[in-house]
Amino acid sequence: MWFENKVTSNKEAFLQKVRLICAKLGIEPDWLMFVMNSESGLNPAAYNPNGGASGLIQFMPDTAKGLGTTTEALRKMSNVAQLDYVYKYFYPYRGKMNSLYDLYLVTFFPAALGKPDSYVLQTSTLPAKVIADANPGIDLDHDDRITVGEFKRWIDLKKKSMGLETGFDVFVIAGSFICAGIILWYILKRDNDD
């Protein structure tokens, strides 16, 4: 599993629970580990003073309240206990998160889930420029707005910088994860062995 070597406490229990909640959500554990590593370095006590985001997936204060807790309480939880709230956060989106991009969009800007690459991240009360100014590393085009496509490119750049370029994509088909690269390898090997 990606980044499992970065888990510093309760490692076996944490990884087992990650696998369990991912199975319930129908997502790849690597995807969730990527998001948690990117957002918090897998630190359940991580805190961003700009806005008060806290925890493994950087819960915002209003989000934590909606989940029946507070960011302060989340920061005091163990990594294993906090996974209950990670699961609770993603649960309404189960069946709709079919890629790492989808999972990360739900984490960062849930309204963008399922939108085309041209969709601009903004709301009637939160202008695109405010979102871009708060996240300059994601505004790759430096045009004071972030599109879904730009967000996906940012994820790809993060993956590449972390050495996670695998040369094949993971597709979700009928609830099963099939690695296209492995299938291609098998077909090529079989054909060459004949």
Segments and roles (model prediction):
Residues 1-141, 148, 152:
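Catalytic glycan-binding domains that act on GlcNAc-containing polysaccharides
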Residues 1-2, 190-194:
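Short acidic DE-rich linear segments
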Residues 18, 63, 155, 172-175, ...:
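Prokaryotic Sec-type signal peptides and long signal-anchor helices
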Residues 153-167:
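Short, aromatic-rich amphipathic segments at membrane interfaces
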Residues 166-192:
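Single-pass alpha-helical membrane anchors
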